[in-house]
Amino acid sequence: MAIDQNTLKQAVYPIVGACHEVHKHLGAFLNEYMYQDALAIELSRRNIPYEKEFAFSADYKGQRIEHQHKADFCVHGADTDILIECKAADKLIDTHRQQLWNYMRLSGIHVGVLYNFAPMYAQCEKYYYDPVTVRMIAF
């Protein structure tokens, strides 16, 4: 499946900007929940529509699984919804990426931002989930 990376970059640009603003004002080494609360404030200030603790389920052989996953945020864009996973870790690791991959795969939302607020220099990774290849593609 061909994806337009410029369209994806434009879609996540305001989200990444809000994350950078939170990191700029709060700095490094805080807990994840403080960054999440601040990001909710920043998204609201920027009039970016979102749901915090976005809950979704999965299907198993046509039946809904009772347990729900919760992504930190789902931003509702004009063209696409975008998941945001916030971290406050020394560095982003494969487990964080796998979590986002699963969330995108199960929720049907194919664009995601993984943002690590804790380091002195924040880490931001942006991904597209391709349901045909079942892979995440960085952009």
Describe the role of every protein-language-model region.
Residues M1-N6, T133-F139:
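Intrinsically disordered, low-complexity and often Lys/Arg-enriched segments
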